[in-house]
Design a protein with these regions (language model features):
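Short amphipathic alpha-helical segments and helix-helix/interface helices
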Residues: 56, 96, 117, 139-140, ...
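Short glycine/serine/threonine/alanine-rich loop segments
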Residues: 65, 126, 178
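Catalytic core of membrane glycerolipid acyltransferases/transacylases, capturing the structured
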Residues: 30-50, 61-62, 77-131
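Membrane-anchoring hydrophobic helices of lipid-metabolizing enzymes
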Residues: 1-81
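Short, basic, glycine/proline-bearing loop/turn elements
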Residues: 56, 80, 122-125, 153-157
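Non-catalytic C-terminal accessory region of glycerolipid acyltransferases
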Residues: 4-7, 133-260
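Alpha-helical membrane-embedding segments
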Residues: 70-86, 116, 138-141, 179, ...
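Structural alpha-helical scaffold elements that stabilize or flank donor/cofactor-binding regions
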Residues: 75, 120-121, 142, 172
């Protein structure tokens, strides 16, 4: 595709997503004031799922994205989980939330105070990551209700290679007794990774594949678990599309290769 078309796709995607967020923010403000917490939680999470799904569908229709996210559907109805994906892009949470109605995002405190994102995030009862203790205290009741906590082990986006893991995933799993589900995101570009300028135009179409990895039981040793999880992701990402034998835990069936 030519540069002008790529620039159009970038602008189209950004404006459409901003329009979705702005429209829903106004609705969420009203719902926050007039709906009970449980009702608001369900509405907020379902709205996020369908809005992100609609946006991704539009981006596929115009030829900007090629996506294989079907593996995530296996997690519907799976009960409480700590979802632990690698984090190559700002789009990672969008991919996961678009398929899972019980996803509970862990967000920076500054984003939860953003006028565009705050109403929807508070309605869905998303969790701030200002401190580990606060994260655990806010995540525990959501997990007890069957939520699936989306928590990136790297803590921030990567810069093309896997970043160092924090102990947050293991700490939450240990304190709540909820298993950790590894999610592997394969990204053929570095679009919206750490250091990618929002005005930088990528070469569309962009291809993404999400597949399920091992499911880890709650650890007794958080530090050892974190090291094991980091090694696991390093092997999976190095293997690319290949399947790597599991070392204990549950390996999901591999997803199909990128379509289109």
């Amino acid at each position: 595709m030519g540069r002008a078309w790529n620039a159009f796709l970038l602008g189209f995607g950004a404006l459409l997503l901003a329009a979705f967020c702005l429209a829903w923010a106004f609705v969420a403000v009203v719902l926050l004031a007039f709906t009970p917490a449980g009702t608001g939680r369900r509405i907020g999470r379902c709205a996020a799922m369908y809005a992100f799904r609609a946006w991704l569908g539009a981006m596929q229709t115009v030829g900007a994205f090629r996506l294989d996210l079907a593996a995530l559907d296996e997690l519907r109805g799976a009960g409480a989980l700590v979802l632990a994906p690698n984090h190559p892009s700002l789009l990672d949470a969008v991919f996961i939330v678009s398929r899972l109605p019980e996803a509970v995002c862990v967000m920076k405190g500054s984003l939860l105070r953003n006028f565009l994102l705050s109403p929807a995030a508070r309605l869905a009862r998303y969790v701030p990551n200002d401190s580990l203790l606060r994260l655990i205290s806010r995540a525990a009741p959501e997990l007890a209700l069957g939520g699936q906590l989306l928590l990136f082990p790297e803590g921030t986006r990567s810069v093309g290679t896997l970043g160092a893991f924090t102990e947050a995933v293991g700490a939450v799993s240990r304190r709540t007794g909820v298993p950790v589900q590894a999610i592997v995101i394969e990204d053929e570009s570095r679009f919206l990774g750490k250091g990618w300028a929002f005005t930088r135009i990528p070469a569309f179409p962009l291809s993404y594949r999400v597949r399920l990895g091992r499911r880890f039981e709650p650890p007794s040793d958080v530090r050892a678990f974190t090291a094991e999880l980091e090694r696991y992701f390093a092997r999976e990402l190095a293997a690319g599309m290949g399947e790597v034998p599991a070392e204990g835990g549950v390996m999901a069936e591999p997803a199909t290769r990128l379509r289109g």
